[in-house]
Design a protein with these regions (language model features):
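Acidic, metal/ion-coordinating pockets
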Residues: 1-181
Length: 181
């Protein structure tokens, strides 16, 4: 939080990120710092499960999803933030965090109506929530998750699940921690 996201934005731009989701730590210093970070990055910042219309710094500037093209294929990316972010960080009183399953399904429906049939959720809501989202939605192909620092592996006995964990037709992977995945 010392650099208020400036160094992270520079590095992420150099790495060529396609998009990212908002996690609770993006709100550690309030919406002002998140907006500064968003202005500094060259890619969309996503959050599907929050109403930011009452926060003028974010209203109209924070997308719920985006579409990228790779190899001639359209990929829909959806952002998912912890529903309890208002308890974990400092988003201020003007942002309302909502239930993740309905938020994700709403974006899946919009993307599929646009002809997108490959949907990836970028989640910072934790492994348990990611499993619930996979079980409660249709049309999500992959969830790339973080927040809970959950180790998934097919060889490590300490792992909390298989890599990938498959729920219905959705593959779930987790970022784990310290650059490991």
């Amino acid at each position: 939080t010392y650099y208020k996201g400036k160094l992270a934005a520079e590095m992420m731009n150099k790495l060529g990120y396609d998009a990212m989701t908002v996690g609770n730590h993006e709100f550690d210093d309030g919406p002002e710092v998140l907006r500064g970070f968003m202005d500094a990055v060259d890619f969309p910042v996503l959050m599907s499960n929050a109403d930011v219309s009452g926060e003028e710094l974010l209203a109209g500037n924070l997308a719920k999803s985006t579409v990228i093209e790779r190899g001639g294929q359209k990929l829909g990316l959806i952002g998912l933030t912890p529903q309890d972010t208002d308890e974990l960080a400092s988003p201020g009183p003007n942002i309302i965090f909502t239930e993740p399953v309905n938020a994700v399904q709403g974006e899946v429906d919009k993307l599929t109506d646009m002809g997108v049939n490959k949907i990836i959720v970028l989640s910072h809501s934790g492994y348990v929530v990611d499993q619930a989202v996979a079980a409660g939605t249709t049309g999500v192909d992959v969830i790339v998750g973080g927040h809970s620092n959950t180790l998934l592996s097919n060889t490590n006995e300490r792992a909390e699940g298989a890599y990938p964990t498959v729920v219905g037709a959705t593959a779930i992977v987790q970022a784990y921690a310290y650059g490991k995945f």
